[in-house]
Amino acid sequence: MTAAKFGDTVPPAAFAAMGHAMLRSLNVSLATALAFLGSLIVPASAQQQPLRSECLAMASAPPLAVPVSLRRTAAKAEDVAITYVGHSTYYIDTPGGVRIATDFNGAYRTERLPDVITMNRAHSTHYTLFPDPKIPHVLHGWGENGQAAHVSTRVGDVYIRNVPTDIRRYYGEDASGAMLKDGNSIFIFEVAGLCIGHLGHLHHKLDDTHFAAIGRLDIVMVPIDGTYTMSLDGISDITRRLRASVVLPMHRFMTPLDEFMRRIGQQFEIDRRGEGTLTISRESLPATPTVIILNGV
């Protein structure tokens, strides 16, 4: 086709064809520009997504999507060290070097301060209002102004979240014997492929909503005093339903361990340790649910 020269008369059909070509070019340019802008916007919005719980995802996945044994899926698992300190306090040391202290009250002194402390407010033996200011992460199991606590945070290689529970009113204006809704928390720590739960100063049975919010637990720390928290029958029922591979007793006082073992049933083995620290990975979880009693419990 010969290009039209200046001054030539352009036939109407040719003029229309030129117009359509220009419009198509504009449409392509506009689509390209929009696609480029979209590529800039999507990553920014993706960064605003909430933290994801792997333990909840595994618990809610369809049966066929869940591996028979999670500990067989990793080529090399990382160890987590769990040390019994006293009462309801365990230290959890992660592969990334984060130290967590559960139900921290400030009474147990070690050479290294924890990086994270969790607290429950049932008694002063489970919290402190004056933690060392050098502890960077202080997580309360109770909220302000009667509201539930909402914990969902990542510290180093560990993701920490909570499940609110109710608490009996003990002292002062709260000494009514009634339950204070959402006054305490179960804390869950997700690290190195393990789901670790600390039931805290639990005062009541858990319903389906609680179990759904907890999700999968590989290791659970349970109070077995049978008095200040809840009955041995009640905590045994909860322990069985959680179906954790490892059960770590705490808050025992003078309760005979055999009484707890008799109630939770013969499907649990018992492993009494001479040391106070359990070093464990998802690969080394016991095949049979086991109550591990660390030195000092």
Task: Tell where the protein language model's regions lie, with residue ranges.
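Active-site-proximal loop/helix segments of hydrolase catalytic cores
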Residues: 169-242, 253-259
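N-terminal amphipathic/basic-hydrophobic helices that include classical n-h-c signal peptides
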Residues: 1-21
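Metallo-beta-lactamase
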Residues: 41-169, 177, 196-199, 218-222, ...
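Bacterial N-terminal signal peptides
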Residues: 29-40
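Intrinsic disorder/low-complexity segments, especially N-terminal tails and targeting/processing regions
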Residues: 12, 30, 43-44
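Generic recognition of flexible, low-complexity loop/linker segments
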Residues: 1, 279-280
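Bacterial N-terminal signal peptides that target proteins for export
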Residues: 19-31
